[in-house]
């Protein structure tokens, strides 16, 4: 990870993820296994765009980027590979509009690796900001309930089983695919436009996968220039302490690692890496 990038800390978890979505997103959204915190998307949109600008999310999931964009008077386009989540994203956008959001948004069903053939070519060179997040290994969110007598029941903790989904591809394929997506995003951006990517490290068979550093390399390979690094907190700030907001699955991974002798700590932030199209 470069050490010379400007660095900021964003207090994006002053409320729990549930509180951030309550009354703003439909209940159907809960089932997605890896949702971006609304405050992260909202803060990025406020920082890198102006009202009336166009925002794109090539892997939009339940439409968090789109919802936060239209609530701030921006227009948005989202691409989603899985039909289930594309439908939820559309419903969330309609819900936002019913609440008075002034921006407009479109959800396109398709594979972001074919972004150039999916999105209307008329917007090429007009996009102010791309926000997205690559799939990041096993640390998805999901739902869980303890069973009587021990154990837990898990649900909504995995992506679909479609082998073409980037979430199921080997790391090398994931990075190649993400580089291709960023390359096509660069063509959509206006000169000086921004790409903001959330990423966090994860472990595979005990080995640390430094996804944030890999994301920067993908961006540079796609012709983008690293601009800023923002620490988007996943824990609340209270005076001189933090309030952990660790998911059941993240806590389980930490406990399992510690039992195996690996001194793992729960992650309290995501990197929001900002790159820029040359002017």
Identify what each model region corresponds to.
Residues 1-279:
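Class I S-adenosyl-L-methionine-dependent methyltransferase catalytic core
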């Amino acid at each position: 990870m470069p050490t010379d990038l400007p660095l900021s800390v964003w207090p994006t978890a002053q409320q729990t993820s549930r509180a951030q979505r309550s009354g703003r997103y439909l209940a159907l959204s809960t089932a997605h296994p890896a949702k971006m915190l609304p405050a992260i998307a909202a803060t990025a949109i406020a920082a890198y765009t102006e009202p009336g600008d166009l925002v794109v999310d090539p892997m939009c999931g339940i439409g968090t980027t789109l919802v936060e964009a239209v609530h701030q008077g921006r227009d948005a386009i989202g691409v989603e590979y899985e039909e289930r989540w594309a439908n939820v994203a559309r419903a969330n956008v309609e819900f936002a509009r019913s609440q008075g959001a002034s921006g407009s948004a479109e959800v396109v069903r398709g594979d972001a690796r074919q972004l150039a053939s999916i999105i209307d070519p008329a917007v090429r060179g007009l996009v102010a900001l791309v926000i997205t997040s690559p799939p990041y290994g096993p640390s998805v969110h999901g739902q869980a309930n303890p069973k009587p007598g021990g154990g837990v029941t898990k649900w909504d903790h995995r992506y679909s089983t479609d082998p073409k989904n980037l979430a199921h591809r080997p790391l090398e394929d994931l990075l190649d695919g993400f580089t291709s997506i960023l390359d096509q995003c660069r063509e959509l951006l206006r000169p000086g436009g921004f790409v903001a990517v959330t990423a966090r490290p994860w472990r595979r068979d005990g080995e640390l996968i430094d996804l944030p550093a890999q994301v920067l390399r993908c961006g540079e390979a796609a012709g983008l220039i690293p601009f800023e690094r923002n620490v988007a907190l996943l824990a609340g700030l209270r005076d001189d302490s933090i309030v952990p907001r660790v998911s059941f699955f993240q806590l389980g991974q930490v406990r399992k690692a510690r039992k195996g002798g690996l001194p793992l700590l729960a992650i309290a932030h995501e990197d929001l890496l900002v790159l820029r199209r040359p002017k």
